[in-house]
Amino acid sequence: MNWIFHLFCAVYGIFCEENSFTIYWNVPTHQCEKLNVSFISLLKELNIVHNKDGNFSGESFTILYSPGLWPSMEHKNITNGGMPQCGNMTLHLEKLEKDVKEKLKDDGYSGLAVIDMESWRPVFRQNTGWMIKYRELTFEQYNKTLAEEYKNNTTNDKLRNRLIKESAEIFEAPAKDFLMNSTELVKKYWKDAKWGYYGFPYCFNMGVAANARNESCPKIVKEENNKTEWLFKSYDYWFPSVYITKVNFTCEERGQLVRGRVTEYQRLRKEFNPKAKIYPYVWFLYNLSNEYLSKEDLEMSLKILKMGKMDGAVIWGSSKNLTKECECKDLYDYVNGTMRTVLEGLKKPENNVKWNGSCQETSDAARYLKNCTDKQ
């Protein structure tokens, strides 16, 4: 019957490459099992890879949140030295091995294993937002006088560029060591696990300012990604993020965000690690919102990933939204309705056409997380 499939594709001029596209479940619906709302049969029916008995961590998929002793200044708390150049590598690796043993247990674990370390970024310049603290303290390590001068005149671009260049020499080498030594250790003891870091590669396309949005990753970020090739060569499973925002973004812009990032993932894989498998994270909510993705946006996101030769996707969700029976039922209805429709549609050859850059906002009423209380 294969020839019929390919004939159909040729006649209608559509893309029908029979590539595997696997959906993984990284949503803590094990909490719902305790509330008598089971997702197990539904996920199995939809061919979404999940762990046995609905467990959050298990034989198919495990995420490890900052295992070890990563230097961090998250939440305004300085822990484990705060910055990579102040961390203790020996203690970190000892704790990392212990934490992974407790989480995976089985030395022969062969599922996806995601290390989620979001305390800082190895490219010094990319530490923005709350991470700006790493810049400020490293500036002071380099030269307190110049750091103070810049603090009093942040419009001095020449001084800023000098501080970033010199401070990167202090920060980036130990940051690289922490990332590389960590993957080397876990790959040594858990050889069959499919290791990777969450978040990488970064792109930073389609910025917040509407007049400065571009589908492509900024040129400087591409250059920085090229210099970070050591990271992309060190593990073969990539877990970047394609979360989309609704407020102040058109549906076309949301699609451009996903497509621009997929283009960069393709480029980096081709140049630095052709055997890498890429499973971008997709959140079923709009970023910074309690609104579910519309059918159109969920379909757009997954279709761009599939047509962009990604190997699949990881569906993510937060535990804080699944603490009550009614919240679990609400998500179940979304998966059984909207997500089912989208996933079944992706299997049809006639739907395997590349996103053309245009779309129409859904006319359906917005659907939000249910603000509910269980039986009193």
UniProtKB/Swiss-Prot annotation:
Predominant location category: secreted
Signal peptide range: 1-16
Coiled coil feature spans: none
Post-translational modification (record): Glycosylated; glycosylation is critical for enzymatic activity.
Biological processes, Gene Ontology terms: carbohydrate metabolic process; hyaluronan catabolic process
Reactions that this protein is recorded to catalyse: Random hydrolysis of (1->4)-linkages between N-acetyl-beta-D-glucosamine and D-glucuronate residues in hyaluronate
Active site: E118
GO cellular component: extracellular region
Gene3D superfamilies in alphabetical order: Aldolase class I
Function (record text): Hydrolyzes high molecular weight hyaluronic acid to produce small oligosaccharides. Up-regulates expression of CSF2, CSF3, LIF, CXCL1, CXCL2 and CXCL8 in cultured human dermal microvascular endothelial cells. Promotes host neutrophil recruitment at the injection site.
Something else known: Enhances dermonecrotic lesions caused by venom serine protease from Crotalus oreganus helleri (hemorrhagic factor). Immunization against the protein protects mice against L.major infection; protective immunity is abrogated in B-cell-deficient mice indicating that antibodies against the proteins play a significant role for disease protection.
Descriptive protein name: Salivary hyaluronidase
Species the sequence originates in: Lutzomyia longipalpis
Gene name linked to the record: HYAL
